UniProtKB/Swiss-Prot annotation:
InterPro entries: HXXEE
Keywords: Cell membrane, Membrane, Transmembrane, Transmembrane helix
Protein name: Uncharacterized protein YrkK
Membrane-spanning ranges: 42-62, 71-91, 102-122, 130-150
Stretches of the chain forming a coiled coil according to its record: none
A Pfam family assignment: HXXEE
Gene Ontology CC terms: plasma membrane
Gene that produces this protein: yrkK
Compartments (UniProt record): Cell membrane
Membrane topology: Multi-pass membrane protein
Record keyword Membrane present: yes
Length: 158
């Protein structure tokens, strides 16, 4: 399972780097999907979220007996699968312009995270109810956290 968790960390890191490079400029155009965000705001938020993802992965690896650690990790896995579709894929289709994060979302996050989830099912580590509830809870927390991180990023960045 260590390799699968490492692949998750690799995938989310590349995805967040893609977003960090191009999303701040992309967000400046009028859109229903994203309010304009500065590089400082976004970079701060994406670093914190990446750190939380790594913490969830390491928590699962080092505390395999902890249901909470497992739920947070599978919540991140599921949330990042959904994130590839909404907003990235839907924004690209609706706006007829590439939304940063789509490529890594479709080519890395969906297959890698789906593989990790599949392996967890094979090893009887999770059931559907845990995956669905964890994805919803972690997804809602991340959605609520993002605007707060943007505000903090604006304050702490030079």
């Amino acid at each position: 399972m260590v390799y699968f968790v490492a692949f998750f960390c690799f995938a989310i890191t590349l995805h967040n780097i893609e977003e960090a490079i191009w999303l701040p400029e992309w967000s400046q155009q009028s859109s229903k999907f994203q309010k304009p965000v500065t590089s400082n705001e976004f970079h701060f938020a994406v670093i914190v979220i990446t750190m939380l993802a790594y913490l969830s992965a390491f928590g699962f690896l080092y505390m395999p007996e902890s249901d909470i650690a497992k739920w947070i990790f599978i919540g991140f896995l599921g949330s990042m699968v959904i994130n590839a579709i909404f907003p990235h894929l839907i924004a690209t289709v609706v706006m007829k312009k590439y939304a940063p994060g789509l490529l890594t979302g479709l080519l890395l996050n969906i297959p890698v995270n789906s593989l990790v989830i599949y392996q967890m099912f094979l090893k009887n580590l999770i059931v559907w109810k845990e995956l669905i509830i964890s994805t919803l809870v972690v997804g809602i927390i991340l959605l609520a956290l993002i605007p707060l991180l943007f505000k903090v990023g604006d304050k702490v960045s030079p």
